[in-house]
Amino acid sequence: KLGAIFAPLLYQATKDGNSIQPRFTLPLVKNRIFGGIAKRSFLNSHSEEICFVDSKQSQKTRKVAIFIGCLGNYNYKNVGESLLVILEALQINAKLAKGQKCCGAPAYFTGDFASVDTLIRQNVEYFESFIEEVDAILIPEATCGAMILEDWKHFMEKDLELKSRIEKLLPKIYMATKYLESQTNLVEILNNIEQNRLKQEFQSPKQTFTYHDPCHARKVLGVYQEPRKLLQQNYQLVEMEDSTACCGFGGVTIQTERFALASKVGSKKAKMIEKTQAQFIVAECSACRMQLSNALYQANVEIPFLHPLELIAKIIKENQNK
């Protein structure tokens, strides 16, 4: 709350409105840009239970919980809002899981293992309290997804009881695009929207996007085809030279103590993105978004960075407004 109140004193919105930049030269931030700070977090903007379908009228009604992640909750709030638009179109009810804690990734990557242990235990206990009432837990963040789906059980390797509890939860936990592509009819819905567009007498060409594969999504979880398949129903994919090359974010230590290295890696990726001449750069990761938005800004490349859920929700809302 204090961040949202005082941020305008130090920062101003970038031209595209998706990030903020310092009004003055500050030693720590070194003129880089960041995701804006929402006045109200995503989790505090809605009731915990969001019903798009009356479950009393239909026994087939599905419900998913949303693990939004810290950056999605406070900085990139529209990711969660977009997921709600999609779930409404799918007639799937949502639980915002307001008792969720940080997944523990920042503490894990900086060696604060006591905090990691506490956060995992708190989250596992909380997930267990509602897991039977939902069909899935969706995570629209690659880093959180990898931490929960892979690192939690490895961290708790010696605590067999807790590791077993984690493994019982995992079958219901998905990266958001993986669940939406494989477990729903979203592809069909988006394809129908596109087919109706093609029937119009005057058709504008498909907007183009290039996709950056977050390390945690593709290299750890194997999620890379699903977001592309969803987006390609309504957008034209222009692959960059190496979509799997790391963006350079590298975690808290790299962003503070080794920022010159992060900038060097980010600059290479920004050049790849610019060469595609795509209208959007897309990735299912807010850490990549923060890093590459800054890299593009420093290179004076005006290509907006969006989450795949934002582009999908954009199509759904445009279709609803016709």
Give short role names for the model-derived ranges.
Residues 1-322:
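Iron-sulfur cluster-binding electron-transfer modules in prokaryotic oxidoreductases
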